[in-house]
Structure formats: C-alpha cells, structure tokens
Design a protein with these regions (language model features):
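Short loop/turn segments immediately following the C-termini of beta-strands
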Residues: 103, 113, 157-158, 203-204, ...
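Blade/loop signatures of beta-propeller domains
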Residues: 32-74, 118-122, 281, 330
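A short beta-strand motif characteristic of beta-propeller blades
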Residues: 74-80, 126-134, 175-180, 221-228, ...
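Beta-rich, blade/repeat-based domains predominating
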Residues: 80-96, 133-149, 181-197, 228-244, ...
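Beta-strand-rich domains and repeat architectures in extracellular enzymes and scaffolds
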Residues: 41-43, 47-52, 78-106
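Short loop/turn segments immediately following beta-strands, especially the blade-tip
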Residues: 112-120, 166-172, 211-218, 273-281, ...
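Short, conserved, GDST-rich strand-edge loop motifs in beta-rich repeat architectures
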Residues: 251-268, 372
C-alpha cells in the first residue's frame, strides 16, 4: 500500500515540476531576472515512474476508498463545553440590566439585574441574546455599556479584529450599528466620557491605543502608549480614574522588547499606573507588583473613583483583589474576596454598580456571574447568582485550541488556548 501510494504521489510531483519549469523557462526567455530574484538553474530529465496497467489500478482505488471511510469515522468521544462561559460583565444601571459576554458560544447575553438562578434550575434564560455570523462577535472578551444610550461595545480578542457596537435593543443575528478595526489581540476596554475617548489594551503588541469614542472603520488612534520604557507585559484589563487623571492597566507578565527578536521573557504580573493622557514611550508612575499583592493572571479591572479603590478580577487565584488608587510596589490588597462560599472560579470580568452598591463578577470557571455587596471580603457567599449551566458544572475553558498532546505519565490531555 505504501509503495503504490508513493508512486501516485511521485507522478503528481513530476507533473507539477514540469509545468512549473515550463513557465519558468518562458519567463526567462522574455526578460532578465533582477539580482537576487528566482532564476532557472537547470532542467534535468527525471526517471519515469513505473507504469501500472489499468487492471492494477482497481485495487488501489479500493484501498483509497477504504482509507476515506476511515477518515470519516465518528470520534469515540468529544470534549466540548455546550454552555455559555462568561468572560466580561457590565451593568446597564439606567435600564436595570446585567450584560454578559459569552466567549464560548460567541454571544452577548442580557439579563434582568435581579435575576437569581435557583439551585434546582439548570440556568436562567436571558432577556435578549446577540449572536450569529452577522454580529461579528467572536472570542468576545471586553465589554462597555454607554451610560446614556445603553449602547453595547463588544471587544473581540482573536479571530475577528473588530470592535462591534450595538444599540441597547439589539437582539438576534443583527449587524452592528458600527464597527472599528482593532489590532490583533485586543482585550480590555474603557471609556472617558468627559473627553469622549475609547481606550483599548493590545496583548501581543504590549500597548494601549486611544480612539475617539465614535471611531469606526479603519480610523487610526489619536494616541498609542507603547515602548520599552512603558513596561506593559501582555496587558489585559484597563480602568480609568478621571478624577485623579490616572490609567490603571493589568499585566499578565509576558514581556518582550519591541523590534528585538528573541527578547521574550516572563516578568511578575502587575497593575501599572500611568497619566491618563500618557502617549508614546511613557514609563508608569507607579507599579503594583510582588508576592504580597497576590496578583496572578489579573484580567479585567474596575476603578471605583468614589471610594478610591481598584478592583481586580484575579483569574489565576480565583479571587477578587481590592487596592487603593494610591498603592505602589509590593503591597497587600486592602480586601480579598475568595473561598468556596464565594463561588468565584477563574474570574475575568468585574463591574462595580455604584448606584446599588454592588459588585458583579463574571466567572469563566463555572458558567456563572455572582453578585456581592461592594465591600464584601473573605469567604462571603453571593447575594445573587446568574448561571448559564447546571450548578457545579465546571467550565472547560477551551478557547480556540491550537494543538493537542497526550501526557502518558499523568494520563492527561493537554491543549494550549
């Protein structure tokens, strides 16, 4: 079987080479090649493959057909999460709604703010869902709600380099009201309503780009914060303190020097603080980082200007950390919300509802969004929970897997996302 298939492949290779060489020869005769350009070196006759009689080709066709059936065979089992996984959250205070990003099934889900899934129920049905090919929503990870209009700003992180903006009433498979082409790996979003500016963090380029809030299409940013002195390292969440003119950016800790191949390195996770109008290669004013901070994969952040606090969704430790806006260096959080009773599992999204004095957390690890008093600390259970799957159902958190491997020693399947 191997020899026969090899002969077929070789016949294809020879045919391709002949066609390509013929084109190259014609091109050479018509014009000279520039120095360094492709040139025809020589044409050598190749030994022809063994000819097979027609009668001998029937078994080959049968073997190839059988191989095709093998390829079409159904898998023994499939590892797939069929429930929504919440990656970001925002509260539409004016309309009493909680909006959640579902990064697993590519949806934006809108719930009543007081929704509370009973322990016996599998899930809570949303009021509205934005989903489908026309929405340009894929691997949606960042979220902002316009406090006046209720417009929904949805950030895509991976396959679609697009920021989609929808009206508050949008539902189903609808076109966005407008879109903005964003750099690949965009994650966090924040808006300065006073200056009408839109801030986005870019993971792979280690930068923050600032656009007009109403920017669309291919419009370029008005400012870009990037450079070797900036200290960004895989930036994720971003929060603004317009009262003190500060910008807070959460970093995972994957760093590299721009335009220096091979300079990639791991640095401690951090919260970097910059002037609100920082531009170019501006170093941070302060950096919150170190073992006492408990930072581990800090995702989205929220700045509570009224109380002078920064809330951090601490994905790697399944906790919510709260720092003062004046903190610097290796400082302990003023509060930590963590423990089995909290039901917090791999939180990535966070929002502080100042009107109702509540904290809302999006948990990627267990298909839930949990609500607490704003000042909650320790192992405090949620006041309300919105679930998109059965109670206790762990989220697989598989997002655009690039490869797969089997660890024979640990009997584990490993896949990077």
């Amino acid at each position: 079987m191997r020899r026969t298939v090899g002969a077929v492949f070789l016949l294809f290779a020879v045919a391709f080479s002949v066609v390509y060489s013929g084109r190259g020869l014609a091109a050479e005769s018509s014009q000279s090649r520039a120095t360094g350009g492709p040139r025809l070196v020589s044409v050598e006759p190749l030994e022809m493959c063994e000819a097979f009689p027609v009668a001998a080709q029937a078994p080959l066709r049968g073997e190839l057909a059988q191989a095709g059936k093998t390829l079409e065979r159904a898998p023994l089992r499939t590892i797939r999460d069929s429930f929504p996984t919440y990656s970001a959250v925002a509260v539409d205070v004016a309309n009493n709604e909680i909006v959640l990003q579902d990064e697993n099934l590519f949806q934006i889900m809108v719930y009543d703010r007081m929704a509370n899934t009973p322990p016996t129920a599998s899930l809570t049905e949303p009021k509205r869902v934005i989903s489908g090919h026309e929405t340009k929503v894929e691997f949606n990870c960042g979220l902002y709600i316009d406090p006046k209009t209720g417009d929904i700003y949805s950030v895509n992180n991976d396959t679609l380099d697009t920021l989609s903006v929808f009206s508050r009433s949008a539902k189903g498979n609808v076109h966005p009201d407008r879109t903005l082409h964003t750099p690949h790996g965009t994650y966090g979003i924040a808006v300065n309503e006073e200056t009408q500016e839109l801030f986005l963090t870019i993971q792979h380029e280690n930068e923050v780009v600032v656009h007009r809030k109403t920017a669309q299409g291919e419009e370029k940013p008005v400012r870009v914060l990037q450079g070797n002195h900036v200290g960004l390292a895989d930036p994720h969440g971003i929060g603004l303190d317009t009262k003190n003119q500060l910008m807070f950016v959460a970093n995972y800790g994957n760093a590299h020097d721009k335009n220096a191949p091979g300079s990639g390195r791991f640095v401690p996770p951090s919260i970097n603080v910059y002037p609100l109008k920082a531009n170019g290669d501006t170093p941070p004013l302060r950096v919150i980082s170190g073992p006492h901070t408990q930072l581990n994969w800090p995702a989205h952040v929220y700045v509570d200007q009224q109380h002078g606090e920064v809330f951090v969704a601490n994905d790697g430790e399944s906790s919510i950390l709260v720092f003062r806006v004046t903190d610097n260096g290796d400082v302990a959080p003023t509060r930590v919300l963590k423990g089995a009773k909290t039901q917090i599992k791999n939180p990535t999204g966070i929002f502080v509802d100042m009107v109702h004095d509540e904290l809302v957390v999006a948990n990627m690890g267990n298909h839930s969004a949990t609500v607490y008093p704003r000042a909650a600390a320790g192992d405090t259970p949620p006041m309300r929970t919105i679930r998109s799957g059965p109670l206790g159902k762990a989220a697989l958190q598989i997002g655009n897997p690039g490869s797969v491997a089997y660890d024979t020693k640990r009997d584990a399947i490993i896949t990077p996302n």
